[in-house]
Amino acid sequence: MKNNFNELNLNSNIILGLEKQGITVPTEIQSLVIPNVLENKDIIAEAYTGSGKTLAFVAPLFQKIDTSKRESQVLILAPTHELVIQITEQIKLLAKNSEVPVTSLSIIGEASIEKQIKKIKETKPHMVVGSAGRILD
């Protein structure tokens, strides 16, 4: 297991953003997942609640996004409305704390599909997070 985020090859802005959240040492799942995401590998991982799974995939995706392009580059599917909201909140927090201008939008079943489609077209978020059912809609 890696002892710090530098060893995982995350850029300094992302590491600073994590530190602002009080996260200075990667968890086991983060140590395993982050390098593989950076290498564009497909990943299936399982870990306990509170183990840092969300940041395990979100942090390296921040590094891969070309923020100069105003287009969607990442689609994240989550099984529940609550998890969609949680992931989106973590993306927004990391964007703020790291000063990496990644934008995101959540797509959920309890909101108007027409309004959500309009919002995607208008804002062109880098990351779209949604429940599988709503994304299929």
Regions from the language model: what does each represent?
Residues 26-28, 35-36, 60, 78-81, ...:
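Proline-centered helix-kink/hinge sites
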Residues 31-43, 53-69, 85, 89-95, ...:
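Walker A/P-loop NTP-binding motif
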Residues 47-51:
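The conserved Walker
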Residues 1-46:
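Conserved pre-motif I regulatory segment
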